[in-house]
């Protein structure tokens, strides 16, 4: 469910990066589309307009944990190989390691679990609206 990936982008920017760096910076220019408009439109489209040909099973929701896991491992590997660096030339461009490696790993774990949670929520909402529209 790729829509969970863009949903994750929306929630990370809105709830984590926005309060730290400022929403006005993260929603400027093209980022307005990437961080706000496209994620919201895709989630709304999935919930209200997408009618799956086959039922999306609960097992499918776990697949959404793969992408942030791979991305997070590549992110950490980049920092391990190249070093964290100093702002503004840092390899930790999200600032996840500002509070140390332990907190950074907890943030990484939370993001992977949040991706799964978003997928479960979207699946449940889609199931409800699909039933509603198919009953008419």
Where are the regions a protein language model picked out?
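Alpha-helical transmembrane segments in multipass membrane proteins, preferentially the mid-helix core
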Residues: 39-56
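Non-cytosolic membrane-interface motifs at loop->transmembrane helix junctions
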Residues: 22-34, 57-61
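Hydrophobic alpha-helical membrane-insertion segments
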Residues: 61-77
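Membrane-interface loop-to-helix entry segments
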Residues: 28-40, 108-109
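Small-polar-interrupted transmembrane alpha-helices in polytopic inner-membrane proteins
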Residues: 1-17
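Interfacial segments of alpha-helical transmembrane regions
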Residues: 1-5, 57-65
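Juxtamembrane "helix-exit" motif on the non-cytosolic side of transmembrane helices
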Residues: 14-24, 80
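Membrane-interface transmembrane-helix boundary segments in multi-pass integral membrane proteins
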Residues: 80-83, 87-123
């Amino acid at each position: 469910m790729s829509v969970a990936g863009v949903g994750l982008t929306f929630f990370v920017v809105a709830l984590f990066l926005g309060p730290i760096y400022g929403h006005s910076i993260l929603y400027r220019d093209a980022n307005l589309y990437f961080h706000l408009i496209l994620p919201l439109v895709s989630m709304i489209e999935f919930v209200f307009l997408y009618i799956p040909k086959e039922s999306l099973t609960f097992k499918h929701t776990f697949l959404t944990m793969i992408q942030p896991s791979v991305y997070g491992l590549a992110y950490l590997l980049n920092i391990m190989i190249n070093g964290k660096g100093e702002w503004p030339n840092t390899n930790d461009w999200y600032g996840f390691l500002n509070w140390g490696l332990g907190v950074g790993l907890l943030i990484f774990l939370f993001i992977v679990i949040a991706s799964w949670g978003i997928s479960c929520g979207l699946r449940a909402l889609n199931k409800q609206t699909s039933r509603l529209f198919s009953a008419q």
